[in-house]
């Protein structure tokens, strides 16, 4: 997983860790562990982040460099 991308996209969008923690209904400390790679982020939270940032889970985890979300079927 490309953990650097979590921090990169958050900073690009001018959010603090505490802002994203609220979106994910978790603590800033927990979210920090995700960004640092100390804990694996659950799939449900990745999906929530992808929707929040209007991108794909594939982009967040580094499977693609295309930031646009996948087209809806």
PLM feature segments, named:
Residues 12, 61-73:
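Short, charged recognition helix plus adjacent turn
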Residues 4-23, 48:
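Short basic helix-loop element that most often maps to the first helix and adjoining turn
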Residues 25-40:
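Recognition helix of helix-turn-helix/homeodomain-like DNA-binding domains
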Residues 2, 6, 56-57:
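Hydrophobic side chains within well-formed alpha-helices
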Residues 35, 53, 61-64:
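DNA major-groove recognition helix of helix-turn-helix
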Residues 25, 44-59:
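DNA major-groove recognition helix of helix-turn-helix/homeodomain DNA-binding modules
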């Amino acid at each position: 997983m490309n953990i650097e991308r979590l921090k990169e996209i958050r900073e690009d969008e001018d959010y603090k860790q505490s802002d994203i923690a609220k979106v994910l209904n978790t603590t800033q400390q927990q979210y920090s562990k995700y960004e640092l790679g100390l804990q694996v982020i659950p799939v449900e939270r990745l999906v929530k982040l992808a929707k929040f940032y209007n991108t794909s889970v594939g982009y967040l985890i580094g499977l693609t460099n295309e930031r646009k979300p996948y087209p809806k079927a």
